[in-house]
Structures are given as structure tokens and as C-alpha cells.
From Swiss-Prot:
InterPro entries: Bifunctional_GlmU, GlmU-like, GlmU_C_LbH, Hexapep, MobA-like_NTP_Trfase, Nucleotide-diphossugar_trans, Trimer_LpxA-like_sf. One of its GO terms (molecular function) is UDP-N-acetylglucosamine diphosphorylase activity. It catalyses: alpha-D-glucosamine 1-phosphate + acetyl-CoA = N-acetyl-alpha-D-glucosamine 1-phosphate + CoA + H(+); N-acetyl-alpha-D-glucosamine 1-phosphate + UTP + H(+) = UDP-N-acetyl-alpha-D-glucosamine + diphosphate. The lineage of its organism: Bacteria, Pseudomonadati, Pseudomonadota, Gammaproteobacteria, Vibrionales. Pathway: Nucleotide-sugar biosynthesis; UDP-N-acetyl-alpha-D-glucosamine biosynthesis; N-acetyl-alpha-D-glucosamine 1-phosphate from alpha-D-glucosamine 6-phosphate (route II): step 2/2; Nucleotide-sugar biosynthesis; UDP-N-acetyl-alpha-D-glucosamine biosynthesis; UDP-N-acetyl-alpha-D-glucosamine from N-acetyl-alpha-D-glucosamine 1-phosphate: step 1/1; Bacterial outer membrane biogenesis; LPS lipid A biosynthesis. Its EC number is 2.7.7.23, 2.3.1.157. Residues 248-453 are annotated as: N-acetyltransferase. Catalyzes the last two sequential reactions in the de novo biosynthetic pathway for UDP-N-acetylglucosamine (UDP-GlcNAc). The C-terminal domain catalyzes the transfer of acetyl group from acetyl coenzyme A to glucosamine-1-phosphate (GlcN-1-P) to produce N-acetylglucosamine-1-phosphate (GlcNAc-1-P), which is converted into UDP-GlcNAc by the transfer of uridine 5-monophosphate (from uridine 5-triphosphate), a reaction catalyzed by the N-terminal domain. It comes from Vibrio cholerae serotype O1 (strain ATCC 39541 / Classical Ogawa 395 / O395). The gene is glmU. Its cofactor is Mg(2+). This is Bifunctional protein GlmU. The active site is at H360. Residues 227-247 are annotated as: Linker. Mg(2+) binds at D102, N224. Binds 1 Mg(2+) ion per subunit.
Length: 453
């Protein structure tokens, strides 16, 4: 179904109390307006006309990778005026869908229903019935069909009793919408050009107006303050959690789970409370994610356990691994099958080989570590000389004792042993033992100082 979209995103968002344009505030880790853009792209919109005003530079910087037609609304003179700024780009025979950058949860199904419902040469309008319609434009019907929309400030007392309200979302043909927009005036209580007045214009021409309801009213709730944004955040997260539960993922507490990207899960995955998923995350079968962990743009293979409060970003974790608690895997970290990293271990751009372990208080950066290696507590790969990064290479079956500093570039051969407390600056051959310690001294007759009375 061919259509183009106008997204209204020019509002300042005064009640957000922020210097950032309202539509750039995030929901599930993504700007609200980006949710709307993604929905349109998923449905195959031919053109997306983004009407902006306040914070234009911020908007264009935040959405630099989006394929949209930027339309400036220099003065905010109402929704009708905003859509009219984009009207020179409308093709006469295409459907024009009007959406809002601060209404991020509208679904693809609802939009498809609206597009399909548009009468020939008429308008399809998205409406919703609210128990408390205060503040919304009322849908005025005459013996069934919609004949007009009356804004709250312009409504009579009788009209204020109407509970069916306008969401602002509509579809019309480009040719008709351009004509109706050109005929708008601002003779109303707010002195603005209302988009809603095109409904009356269509009715006056004898055009049909078809009302469609969303699957759930939360889809058409807008955001004007942080309270409303928080409400939509929880609604969105609840919806995502429900889908995961239906797919067989065990969320220990769905209300304490945040998905801020995409998650692909195998079978029998268990996710404990307060876990945050960001970016694109893939989890295999029989994986356990401990409480308070953060996973971003990473892959975790089958039968792996991520213990509580681990942070994994841009990393790959193999099968049968154990990570954490309190582990940080940074971009480029890779754990091969059966590897273990424990509490307060940090890895970046480093590979830990099959069956290797670094269980305590360790930094592994720019390192290649082979199979069956034991990395003791307090080991540091000294990879940075103040100007450049250097690599540490450790072969298979190496034992690195506690509190060692491996000053890169350095290579340790297979089966070597590095004694505790060693500062290593030279390569080590296969099977060698290397120890660099200060001589141990025993001071005869020494006594502790006595405390002053």
C-alpha cells in the first residue's frame, strides 16, 4: 500500500523542563520520534516528511542517519499550519498519513487498519473513547457519520460531554489534503490553524469520513511531561515483557525488566530482576542472566551463566561459560567455550581461550589468551604506553600467578609459568618459569612501635 507520512515534531515541550526538543527524549533507549520513523519504515512509507521547529540542529544531529525530508515550521501556528508546510511535497494521488513525534507507541496494525479504511476521496480518522476526555478535541457525529471535530476550548457544554475524541492521526489523499489545508483559518479560541478543521471541510464537500479505533488507547497517548513519558515507558516495557514470556523466556519479574533494543532468545532462558538489554542482543539456549546485569550489543551462547551485576557490551561469550558477578566485558572481548571470568574482571579487545579462567580482580586488554590458561588474582596486562596500545599473547596451558604485570608487547609460550608478583617485560619461551621479585629480607630483633599512653 503506497503512502507517505508527515510526522509533526516541531513542539518545544515546555513541560519537560529540558533544553532538548521533546521528541528526542527517549523511550526504551530510543528517541520518541525514532519509534514513529521506524514504524513508518517498517510499513514501507515512500516518503517521511519530518516537520521540525525548536532545536532544529539537535534534531538533525540526533537523526542524522534517518532518511527523512526535513520541513521547517519556523512559527508554531497550529497543527494545520504544520502539515501545510509539508504539503508542497505531497503527490496528488498518494495517501498522506499524519502522525506525531510525541505519540511513540502507535502500532503497525493500527496504521494498516487506518490506511485500509480510508474511503475513496475521503478521510480515515483515528479516534478513541476516553472516560475522561478533558483536553481533547471531541468527535461530532450526525446520525452516525463524523461531521466535525471541536477542540476543548471551542466546545459547547453539550459537546464537552462527548467521550469519543480525536487523536490527530488521519489519512487523506494528497490532492484533497492540500486543498483543505489551503482553506483553513485561525478564527478560534487559540488563534491557530487546526488540522482538525479539514474534517468539516471534507464533510461540506460530501466526502466520507471513516473513524477507526486503535487496538489499545495507550497507542495514541501523547507525551507532554516526564510523568506521561514514564507511564508510556512502563507500558512499552510491559508489552515487550509479555511477548518474551509468551515465547518461553522466564522473566523473574516482568515489571523489573527493561528491553531497550532487540533480543533474540533460545529456549529455557531465565532472566532475573533489574536486567537491562540494549542494542542487539542474542542469547542461546539454557542461559541464565543474573540480577542487575546490563547486556548491550552482545552474543551469549548456550548453557552460559551470567552472574549478577555483570556488564557486557560488544562482546561474544561462548558455550558453557561463567561470567561474574561484577564482571565487565567491553567491546571486542571474547570468551571461548568453557571459559570463566569472575568478580571484578575487566576485558577489552581480548580473547580468553577455551577452558581458561580469570576469576578475580584482573584487567585483560589487547590480549590473546590460549586454552587452559589460569590467570591469577590481580593480574594486569599493561597495554598502553601513554601513546599507543600494545598486545599481550599468552599460549596454551600457561599459569600466571597473582599480582603480575604483563608489560606489552610481550609473548608467553605454551606451558610457561609466571610466578606471583612478577613484572614481565620480556618474552617467555615454552615451559619456562619466570619470577621477578625483590629479595625477601628478615629483620632480626625488630619490634612494633609501642602506642603512646
Amino acid at each position: 500500500m503506497k503512502f507517505s507520512t508527515v510526522i509533526l515534531a516541531a513542539g518545544k515541550g515546555t513541560r519537560m523542563h529540558s533544553n532538548m526538543p521533546k521528541v528526542l527524549h527517549t523511550l526504551a533507549g530510543k528517541p520518541m520520534v525514532k519509534h514513529v520513523i521506524d514504524t513508518c519504515n517498517n510499513l514501507g512509507a515512500q516518503n517521511i516528511h519530518l516537520v521540525y521547529g525548536h532545536g532544529g540542529d539537535q534534531m538533525q544531529q540526533a537523526l542524522v542517519n534517518e532518511s527523512v525530508n526535513w520541513v521547517l515550521q519556523a512559527q508554531q501556528l497550529g497543527t494545520g499550519h504544520a502539515v501545510d508546510q509539508a504539503s508542497p511535497h505531497f503527490q496528488d494521488d498518494e495517501k498522506i498519513l499524519v502522525l506525531y513525534g510525541d505519540v511513540p507507541l502507535i502500532s503497525e496494525d493500527t496504521i494498516e487498519s487506518l490506511l485500509e479504511a480510508q474511503p475513496t476521496d475521503g478521510i480515515a480518522l483515528l479516534t478513541v473513547v476516553l472516560e475522561d476526555p478533558t483536553g481533547y478535541g471531541r468527535i461530532v457525529r450526525k446520525r452516525g457519520p463524523v461531521v466535525a471535530i471541536v477542540e476543548q476550548k471551542d466546545a459547547s457544554e453539550e459537546q464537552k460531554l462527548i467521550k469519543e475524541v480525536n487523536t490527530g492521526v488521519l489519512v487523506a489523499t494528497g490532492r484533497d489534503l492540500k486543498r483543505w489545508l489551503a482553506g483553513l483559518n485561525n478564527n478560534n479560541a487559540q488563534g491557530e490553524y487546526y488540522l482538525t478543521d479539514v474534517i468539516a471541510a471534507a464533510h461540506d464537500e460530501g466526502r466520507a469520513v471513516e473513524a477507526v479505533h486503535p487496538s489499545h488507547s495507550i497507542e495514541v497517548e501523547g507525551v507532554n511531561d516526564r510523568i506521561q513519558l514514564a507511564r508510556l515507558e512502563r507500558a512499552f516495557q510491559a508489552r515487550q515483557a509479555k511477548k518474551l514470556l509468551e515465547q518461553g523466556v522466564m522473566l523473574r519479574d516482568p515489571a523489573r525488566f527493561d528491553l531497550r533494543g532487540t533480543l533474540q532468545c533460545g529456549s529455557d532462558v531465565e532472566i532475573d530482576v533489574n536486567v537491562i538489554i540494549e542494542g542487539n542482543v542474542s542469547i542461546g539456549n539454557n542461559v541464565v542472566i543474573g540480577a542487575g546485569s546490563i547486556l548491550k550489543d552482545c552474543e551469549i551462547d548456550d548453557n552460559t551463566v551470567i552472574r549478577p551485576y555483570s556488564v557486557i557490551e560488544g562482546a561474544t561469550v561462548g558455550e558453557n561459560c561463567t561470567v561474574g558477578p561484577f564482571t565487565r566485558l567491553r567491546p571486542g572481548a571474547e570468551l571461548r567455550d568453557d571459559a570463566h571470568v569472575g568478580n571484578f574482571v575487566e576485558m577489552k579487545n581480548a580473547r580468553l581461550g577455551e577452558g581458561s579462567k580469570a576469576n578475580h580482580l584482573t584487567y585483560l586488554g589487547d590480549a590473546e589468551i590460549g586454552k587452559g590458561v589460569n590467570v591469577g588474582a590481580g593480574v594486569i596486562t599493561c597495554n598502553y604506553d601513554g601513546a599507543n596500545k600494545h598486545k599481550t599473547v599468552i599460549g596454551d596451558d600457561v599459569f600466571v600467578g597473582s599480582d603480575c604485570q604483563l608489560v606489552a608487547p610481550v609473548t608467553i609460550g605454551n606451558g610457561a609459568t609466571i610466578g606471583a608478583g612478577t613484572t614481565l617485560t620480556k618474552n617467555v619461551a615454552e615451559g619456562e618459569l619466570v619470577i621477578t621479585r625483590a629479595p625477601e629480607r628478615k629483620i632480626a630483633g625488630w619490634q612494633r612501635p609501642a602506642k603512646k599512653k
